[in-house]
């Protein structure tokens, strides 16, 4: 197989250049006449991932998982999902914040971003949102509870992609950051990175 010439080639080769499920590569012409059942929001952080992974690792991986989930939902259940562009604003722990270009986002800022997204989707008739979280510092439970008061008929669910399976069943030395798990998943989605 020839070597990839860029991210677009990787997306095409792996089937991720799907304008019907991925808003990052879609256009109004592809989505305007389709009805979407669920919006999927990848959420990560901007932070160093050791010396070998990109700063946006959490976003890249949660986006890849979200696209896979959207494609599976369509194929297996006939559910139309749209994957939103990933949010790169995460909550950071002290000790991490001092590292160059590590961006910390306060709870209030994250809540404001989520509120604006929910409010936009609500006006457009979408009533279901799944957050695919890729960063351990992010917590959405309180935000979701607060939003349910203002939007009682809007369902929001959140899942950390890295907790769905027991990593110890698949990896010899799992850790929790820039480890064997994140490195392997990055190699799956974007070997060129």
Map each language-model feature to its residues.
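Short helix-capping segments at alpha-helix termini
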Residues: 72-79, 148-154
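Domain-level recognition of soluble alpha/beta enzyme cores
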Residues: 176-184, 188-193
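Single conserved hydrophobic/aromatic residue that forms the stacking wall/gate
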Residues: 1-14
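Extended amphipathic ligand-handling, pore-lining, and cofactor/metal-binding catalytic surfaces
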Residues: 52, 56, 77-79, 97
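Short coil-to-beta-strand
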Residues: 33-43, 79-91
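Short catalytic helix/loop segments, enriched in acidic residues and glycine
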Residues: 58-71
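Active-site and ligand/interface coordination hotspots across diverse enzymes
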Residues: 13-54
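Active-site histidine-anchored catalytic micro-motif
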Residues: 19, 89-181
